[in-house]
Structures are given as structure tokens and as C-alpha cells.
């Protein structure tokens, strides 16, 4: 019994952490924890999860209890990894495997799910920025300018992620860089509409997934977790606006 109890504790700690980091909803993370624990005949499960921390207390039929706490310091959206983790949780519930199998599976998911390389990310960033600039009414030249700035933006984002710069400061820097280059391009004649070029790139920074997940968390009853994620999305939005305002003040773009 205690062996199965340790299995459940180990799985919950690693599995839920990977899910939350990959962009899973709070309710989905907690539901997976409870299902896995039930598969290992855990008598009582108390789970508390927010965007930056997770706590789970497990109690077996003999009264033994284990509390696992994990601090979450980074978030990103990785749907491939999330799909594999969800599939693994279903296998765990069906088969109740030993600890070595679970550890190996989680390690394989971590190693086998790799990010796209930087050139591909820059290419996609350029295509998205250019497409949005034209979609919102910009000329073809505005789209080209937005695409070039999109490459620069991705390089800045990549650098801030590698150096682990504070999220709010990183968004201020990214927004300021995007807006400054956009103003400079238009002044040099490489583009017609500053706002369209800026909008095309700002769309890459908007925390749409975080905002959507926060609303879903609140609807599902996780008010605290939803509010924290909502506040995080609002702070990111304010940081983006701050970067634009600084650039506009320097280049005299406010009110034009």
C-alpha cells in the first residue's frame, strides 16, 4: 500500500508541474491529480493549485500522509507536450504502472518534445506580424515592415527568456523596441502607417491564452487561480502599453 502511495505522490508532483508549465488549465491539473491518486487507492486528496504554486496532501488508508509542494517559475504554451501528458495520465489510471515506468515516460516526454529552432520561430513571427498588419488595414509595405520587426521582436523575446528577465520588464522592452523601430521605419519612408505596423507586432505579445484560461478557471469555480492569471494578463497588457507610450513620447507619436 505504501509503495502505491509513494507512486501516487511522485506522479502527482512531477506530472502536475509539467502540465501547469505547459499551459494547462487549473481545473484540468487538479482533476488529473485526483484521478491518478484514486487509481492508487489514496483515501484522501487535497489539492491547491495557482499559477505559481502547487500543494497536494495525500492520505492513505493507514493514516500516512504526504504533502508535496512545487514552485512554478515559468509558463509557456506547449500543446504537444500537454497532449502527451494527458495521454500519460489516462494510461496511469488504466494500468496503474510502477514508479520506474512513470519516471521514464515523463523523461521521454520532456526530452522528445522540443521547441522549434530559432530560425523557424523568427520566420513564423515575421509571417504573423506581417499578416496582422495587412489584416488591420495596412499597405503591403506596412506588412513587409511589420514582418522585419517581427523577426527583431522574436530575437528580443528569445534573449529575455534565456536571461530570465522579469516578465513585466521584458514586455516593456519588447513593446518599446517594436514601436521605436516602427516609428523609425515610417520616418525613413519604409512604411506608411505606424499604427498598423505596431498592431501587427503587438498581437504577438498579447496574452490571449492566459486571459482565456483565467476566465475558464473562474467559470469552473477556481476564482483565486483565475483572478491571479487575469491580473497577470492585465499587467502584461499594461507593460505593453507602457512600452508604446515611452516610444511615442520619444518619437512624438502620441496624438498623431
What are these regions (language model features)?
Residues 187-256:
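Generic detector of multi-pass transmembrane helix bundles and their immediately adjacent loops
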Residues 17, 21, 38-42, 90, ...:
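Generic secondary-structure signature for well-ordered alpha-helical cores
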Residues 74-128, 133-142, 232-241, 252:
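Alpha-helical transmembrane segments and their cytosolic membrane-interface
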Residues 105-109, 153-164, 212-225:
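C-terminal ends of transmembrane helices
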Amino acid at each position: 500500500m505504501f509503495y502505491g502511495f509513494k507512486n501516487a505522490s511522485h506522479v502527482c508532483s512531477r506530472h502536475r508541474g509539467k502540465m501547469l508549465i505547459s499551459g494547462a488549465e487549473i481545473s484540468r491539473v487538479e482533476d488529473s491529480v485526483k484521478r491518478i491518486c484514486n487509481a492508487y487507492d489514496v483515501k484522501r486528496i487535497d489539492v491547491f493549485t495557482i499559477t505559481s504554486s502547487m500543494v497536494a496532501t495525500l492520505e492513505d488508508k493507514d493514516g500516512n500522509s504526504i504533502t508535496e509542494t512545487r514552485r512554478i517559475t515559468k509558463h509557456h504554451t506547449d500543446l504537444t507536450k500537454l497532449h502527451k501528458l494527458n495521454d500519460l495520465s489516462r494510461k496511469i489510471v488504466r494500468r496503474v504502472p510502477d514508479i520506474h515506468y512513470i519516471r521514464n515516460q515523463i523523461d521521454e516526454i520532456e526530452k522528445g518534445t522540443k521547441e522549434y529552432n530559432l530560425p523557424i520561430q523568427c520566420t513564423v513571427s515575421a509571417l504573423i506580424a506581417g499578416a496582422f498588419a495587412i489584416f488591420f488595414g495596412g499597405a503591403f509595405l506596412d506588412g513587409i515592415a511589420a514582418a522585419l520587426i517581427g523577426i527583431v521582436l522574436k530575437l528580443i523575446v528569445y534573449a529575455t527568456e534565456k536571461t530570465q528577465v522579469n516578465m513585466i520588464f521584458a514586455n516593456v522592452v519588447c513593446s518599446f523596441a517594436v514601436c521605436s523601430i516602427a516609428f523609425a521605419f515610417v520616418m525613413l519612408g519604409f512604411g506608411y502607417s505606424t499604427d498598423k505596423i505596431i498592431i501587427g507586432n503587438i498581437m504577438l505579445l498579447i496574452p490571449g491564452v492566459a486571459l482565456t484560461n483565467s476566465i475558464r478557471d473562474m467559470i469552473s469555480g477556481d476564482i483565486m487561480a483565475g483572478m491571479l492569471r487575469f491580473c497577470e494578463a492585465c499587467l502584461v497588457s499594461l507593460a505593453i502599453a507602457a512600452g508604446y507610450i515611452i516610444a511615442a513620447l520619444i518619437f512624438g507619436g502620441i496624438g498623431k
